[in-house]
Amino acid sequence: MGVSGSGKSTLGALLASALGATFLEGDSFHDAAAVAKMRSGQPLNDADRWPWLDRLGAAIDAEVRVNGLVVAACSALRRSYRDRLVAAITAPTRFILLDGSPEELRQRLANRAGHYMPSSLLASQLCTLERVAPDEAATTLDAAASPDRLCAEAIAWLDSGGHPVEEQKR
């Protein structure tokens, strides 16, 4: 999870491959109207996001029931969005926030080709982002690390039980 340009898709694909899991790209579940809205530089609002989260949550749950393990790349910027996904998925759900500096994220977006999300929306995503709370089954990783290092750190966290942030500090 994280804002645009944080490396969600890169880490998600690597992690899914390493775990033998199915990878789902959350961006693929946006409807045409939401994609057009973002492409035109308008940020999404909750009314745009709820149906997307419902489609993604249903797809994750269906895939879990068939294949057992799923990794999904999804912004999940607010706690309420993460809670919505958790409610839709009948298996334990963990979140990994990829946290990067605004400068690094802007640079990544400037160098990214072929994506509908313009870099002009980064500021609104950063304002919307609610960092993971201590009671969430989540961890935060430094988006500046290499994809291989992020994958290794994610696997280590998952192997340790993927405990909520407050339990990691004990």
Where is each model-derived feature located?
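Structural recognition of the conserved hydrophobic beta-strand(s) that form the central parallel beta-sheet
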Residues: V70-C74
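C-terminal accessory "lid"/substrate-recognition subdomains
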Residues: L158-R170
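ATP-dependent NMP and nucleoside kinases share a basic, alpha-helical "lid"
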Residues: V64, S75-A113
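Conserved lysine of the Walker
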Residues: K8
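P-loop (Walker A) phosphate-binding loop of NTP-binding proteins
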Residues: V3
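Small-molecule kinase domains that catalyze NTP-dependent phosphoryl transfer to phosphate-bearing small molecules
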Residues: N111-E153
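Conserved substrate/cofactor phosphate-moiety recognition/catalytic segment
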Residues: A13-L56
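Short, amphipathic alpha-helical "lid/cap" segments that border enzyme active or binding sites
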Residues: L53-G57, P147-L158
